[in-house]
Design a protein with these regions (language model features):
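Structural micro-motif
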Residues: 50-60, 68-69
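Membrane-interfacial helix-loop segments of redox and metal-homeostasis proteins
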Residues: 49, 89-242
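Non-catalytic, surface beta->alpha helical segment in thiol-disulfide oxidoreductase systems
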Residues: 61-84
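Thioredoxin-like thiol-disulfide oxidoreductase module
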Residues: 35-52
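Conserved helix-turn-beta segment immediately C-terminal to the redox Cys motif
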Residues: 20-35
Length: 242
């Protein structure tokens, strides 16, 4: 038998997963014989020879371990479930927009915490969340139909919403056209909050939220409600200051 430090492993690859497999093996102390599959013909021949459907494939001491996920399991590491839900995308957005608001306040006023910091945090969040929805407008609109009360009655609202959220966020950041941006934010935030509350807390439905776009695995819940409540609070605040 060979010690881990000297054990030989072969990685057959033609894509980024091969680089990840090689990095993981080296981090575990393995010497890697990195064998590239340079052409489609070579890749197809390799798959046929070993009866596999994907590359890369890892072999340790002439024993086939499998693909990258199989390699992680071999080392006892967690393998991400592609269907698992997570609040991480929304939390990342809020963290980045909060830090950006602090930075903007520091630049504009010489202090990170000012009256504008919270305003900018909310308006920046609206802009980023709206932008994420706009990346896949059809996907968002379809997912939105699962729970939004207005979209279920008037389907085109699913395509209008991302533009309304982004536009209101931009105008609120600039404190421009408050007579337009605040009512828009109040309207879409109010409908959104009612929709999420009904779906989650009354109907007890387990749905995915379209808050970061149509392909997200974010569960519909408290953070989804928070997005809408922030828009409502921002709209009321700006209307009160007019």
């Amino acid at each position: 038998t060979q010690s881990r430090s000297s054990a030989a492993s072969d990685v057959y690859k033609r894509q980024a997963w091969g680089l990840r497999a090689r990095h993981l093996l080296k981090s575990k102390g393995y010497q890697v014989d990195d064998r590239w599959l340079e052409t489609r013909e070579a890749t197809d021949a390799f798959k046929a020879e070993h009866g596999v459907k994907t590359t890369p494939q890892t072999f340790i001491d002439e024993r086939r371990i499998g693909g990258f996920d199989d390699l992680r399991r071999f080392f006892g590491l967690r393998v991400r479930d592609p269907e698992a839900t997570s609040y991480t995308p929304v939390l990342v957005v809020f963290a980045v927009t909060a830090l950006t608001a602090l930075a903007a306040s520091h630049t504009a006023y010489g202090a990170p915490l000012t009256g504008r910091t919270i305003e900018w945090f909310i308006s920046f969040s609206m802009c980023v969340l709206g932008m994420l929805k706009l990346q896949n407008l059809d996907g968002f609109a379809t997912m939105f139909l699962n729970y939004d009360l207005l979209a279920r009655r008037w389907v085109p609202y699913g395509w209008v919403y991302p533009f309304a959220e982004t536009g209101a966020g931009v105008l609120m950041t600039a404190h421009a056209l408050t007579w337009l941006s605040a009512p828009v934010a109040l309207f879409i935030g109010g409908i959104g909050a009612a929709s999420v509350f009904k779906a989650v807390y009354i109907d007890r439905r387990e749905l995915k939220c379209a808050c970061v776009g149509g392909d997200s695995k974010v569960p519909l819940g408290f953070l989804s409600l928070t997005e809408n409540l922030m828009m409502i609070a921002m709209a009321v605040w700006m209307l009160a200051r007019m």
